[in-house]
Amino acid sequence: MTLDDIERGIVLTIDKPYGWTSFQVVNKIKWQIKRELGLKKFKIGHAGTLDPLATGVLLVCVGKATKRIDELQGGRKIYTGTIVLGATTPCFDLERAIDAYYPTAHITESLIKETALRFVGEIEQVPPMFSADKVDGERAYSYARDGEQVEIAPKKVSIDSFEITAIRNLGSDTPVPPLSTLSAPASDTSEKELYRHPQGIVPPMLPQVDFRICCGKGTYIRSIARDFGLALGSGAFLSSLRREQVGIYSLSDSIQVQSGTDVSF
């Protein structure tokens, strides 16, 4: 990257690593640019947050490209991942441990595929409590981490497609382990290291559904997982998520980011 790139503005397609916040990725790039180009002040930001436990395309805008953030956030997004059926977590992913089990014996492959089709189109979803959506001027996750329950207004989102690509463990009668065995000891995990050591553990006998979703701005895939479980008459949470594409930007053009090494622009 050169000073001319900063002057013109540049969009970096980053493959966000597992366990990193979007802010951590931006901060790493920011300090590397400062060090390499000797800049003290310049604009930098990302177009569309990715959850810490998700990986994939994160668009980092540098210089004049920050003016395009709103435009880039509006690009259609493609996600792949896995939904676990028969259990829930408070945050709808593995940031927290399983808090309840639900029946799955009635769930069939045809029911799963038929239910996925019901999510295609313009739908309403309620963002997770563990999210950056604001409630009375405060981020929802601030209330969630304090144990407060607040009402988050539903919002309309657009789903172009919801494809089921694989189904595993359907019809398993294996008993699930006690809830107390499914979380890492809190004393072993500091707040700083929370995302590098997720609290939730997936019991291998629970049904798992791999998917591919194409959707519009503001869609929470964690909320889709929660709502998918409810629509199946059970519970569900997201166990993995990868963003494959945002608009014209895809993983095939992405830059890798790692701890302890510089980013190759």
Indicate residue ranges for each PLM-predicted region.
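Catalytic/RNA-binding core of pseudouridine synthases
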Residues: 1-265
